[in-house]
Amino acid sequence: MQIRLAVRLAFRELKGGIRGFRIFLACLALGVMAIAGVGSLSEALVSGLNSKGQSILGGDLSITMMHRTLNADEEKWLQARYDISSSNEMRSMVRSSQAEENAETDQMRHALVELKAVDSFYPLYGTLRIKPAIDPRVALGLQQPKSADGNENVNYGALVEPTLLETLGIEVGDTIKIGSGFFPVTGVILSEPDRLSGGFSIGPRVLLNEAGARHSGLYQPGSFVENNYRLRSIIPLSEGDLKAAKVEMNEAFPDAGWQIKERTDASPSLRRSIE
């Protein structure tokens, strides 16, 4: 009897152990599948970054300079090898004066924004999508429409992200104040091709043309301005060619003090987050 009881208890323990082991195996399989899935997703995202590197960076190469622009020698050297689009960025306050119904005074609303001024070649890669669906160059005043007498109408338009409209309580067609300049909101930014390459952002984007930005009066000695130059190679460049071009630029101007990025690493911060 004691032997039978011992055998019966042993079989019961064995059955319970097998059930527990099955649960362990199931958990192990789920863990392996989860790790494999995350790895595959990470590889897909990194591959997407590499394939869209030109659009994300805005060029094959980019140059960033603080507090100064390219000098004549640097610009001439680069223009012989690349198509160039220049832009500059700074943070600024934007204000809107909106008259409320039955109010004696206007209600002042303001917001901190990421201000970006672009030239007529922007963007070299990708598409700047806005609403309404008009040519962004016209919306920014980079291509001025002609009046009846044949003269160009100077229009320093502003393109803004939707969140700024909500913050200021305005809509397309209203006017915003940036620095000492007033700018009509001519469109809403739906997609900015090189937005991811800029890294950390603390406010909505506002796009102006370079002449309009100077009209704002914000660009003064000591202003914290980041000057960017997107470069599109005249001939196709491989990954090795990009690295060689970067070395060539630094050797040609060793004291330039610029930061150069390649399309293969268009957004380092995003890549680190994914990996």
Locate the predicted segments by residue.
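Membrane transport/envelope proteins' first extracytoplasmic loop
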Residues: 3-275
